[in-house]
Amino acid sequence: MTNIRKTHPLMKIINDSFIDLPAPSNISSWWNFGSLLGVCLILQILTGLFLAMHYTSDTMTAFSSVTHICRDVNYGWLIRYMHANGASMFFICLFLHVGRGMYYGSYMFMETWNIGVILLFATMATAFMGYVLPWGQMSFWGATVITNLLSAIPYIGTDLVEWIWGGFSVDKATLTRFFAFHFILPFIIAALAGVHLLFLHETGSNNPSGLSSDSDKIPFHPYYTIKDILGVLILIMILTSLVLFSPDLLGDPDNYIPANPLNTPPHIKPEWYFLFAYAILRSIPNKLGGVLALVMSILILAFLPLLHTAKQRSMMFRPISQCLFWILVADLLTLTWIGGQPVEHPFIIIGQLASILYFTIILVLMPLASIVENNLLKW
């Protein structure tokens, strides 16, 4: 008799995705982040659900409701900080997952990659709206600054901003709709992640060598289930350490001050995971130019398959490209640092140079390095 997991319509899908899935025998721990992102998403949806049971999306009571969750709800402080720091872990995994894709040429799976880029945008939108909900100073002013960027769009900009606000400023209508969107988007992200996996399983996983692994496949379970569980344990260990020892390490103290439209904080800045994009935005002394650079800083990922000039898929055997890749990583860390600094000398010029370098490496230097490496192969 055939095993039920191979015949039952529902269990067959799970079996073909997580149990009998043929996987390359040589994928490293850099391939763990897909499953870790799944764990992060489930964690965020669950903690978010319990937070939504006690949260009120009204400007008068939002801040108080978050205080109530932390003080009066059973383990409310734990749920709240797991959710806030879970977002940070989510983005750490996202950045490492995307970096892995860039390094090993995973972007050659075009459908999988493009859905991944859409997922990144959706996650960033969700995180931004979530940051507005506690209705602290940085929530309010962050929402004001970022939504205001849309006014840079010619002709329709101002109308668009007022339409999103639901009035002439960030107010009750804005908070209510942001809560609604923040609730629904993670489920859209989950659906997109399913499509992401669907397209990935059409081709099979890439591997560090960038070569076809069709001749050497192993079942996903038990090999990679066990390997993924180790990753999950490390993730949970880091997250619980963060939540229990320094829950406010990555937050902004200004967000413990209730939102006040009459008082602007000295330094308006987003959460740490947006600082690199924020630094690029601020580097251009023109509103529309800055917004375009901000969008392109992420959208540029969609153009990577077109910029791939190498004869090899992975960077494993391409030392010049490797060098440029790690310079790009250092550049992104520099941009993250600059994004959190005030707009004054020398930070302005450092940010501008780092922004130029970011686009130059991806658009010019990496394709050129690949061509050089192709020619070196002929020697």
UniProtKB/Swiss-Prot annotation:
Cell compartment(s), UniProt: Mitochondrion inner membrane
UniProt cross-references to InterPro entries, sorted A to Z: Cyt_b/b6_C, Cyt_b/b6_C_sf, Cyt_b/b6_N, Cytb/b6-like_sf, Cytochrome_b, Cytochrome_b_C_euk/bac, Cytochrome_b_N_euk/bac, Di-haem_cyt_TM
Binding site for a ubiquinone: H201
Transmembrane domains' residue ranges: 33-53, 77-98, 113-133, 178-198, 226-246, 288-308, 320-340, 347-367
GO cellular component: mitochondrial inner membrane; respiratory chain complex III
Membrane topology: Multi-pass membrane protein
GO MF entry, a single one: metal ion binding
Keyword Hydrolase appears in the UniProt entry: no
Binding site for heme b b562: H83, H182
Residues reported to bind heme b b566: H97, H196
Cofactor names: heme b
Keyword annotations from UniProtKB, A to Z: Electron transport, Heme, Iron, Membrane, Metal-binding, Mitochondrion, Mitochondrion inner membrane, Respiratory chain, Transmembrane, Transmembrane helix, Transport, Ubiquinone
Free-text remark on how the cofactor is bound: Binds 2 heme b groups non-covalently.
GO biological processes: mitochondrial electron transport, ubiquinol to cytochrome c
Principal subcellular localization: mitochondrion
Subunit structure: The cytochrome bc1 complex contains 11 subunits: 3 respiratory subunits (MT-CYB, CYC1 and UQCRFS1), 2 core proteins (UQCRC1 and UQCRC2) and 6 low-molecular weight proteins (UQCRH/QCR6, UQCRB/QCR7, UQCRQ/QCR8, UQCR10/QCR9, UQCR11/QCR10 and a cleavage product of UQCRFS1). This cytochrome bc1 complex then forms a dimer.
Note: Heme 1 (or BL or b562) is low-potential and absorbs at about 562 nm, and heme 2 (or BH or b566) is high-potential and absorbs at about 566 nm.
Entry function: Component of the ubiquinol-cytochrome c reductase complex (complex III or cytochrome b-c1 complex) that is part of the mitochondrial respiratory chain. The b-c1 complex mediates electron transfer from ubiquinol to cytochrome c. Contributes to the generation of a proton gradient across the mitochondrial membrane that is then used for ATP synthesis.
Family: Belongs to the cytochrome b family.
Name of the protein: Cytochrome b
UniProt lineage: Eukaryota, Metazoa, Chordata, Craniata, Vertebrata
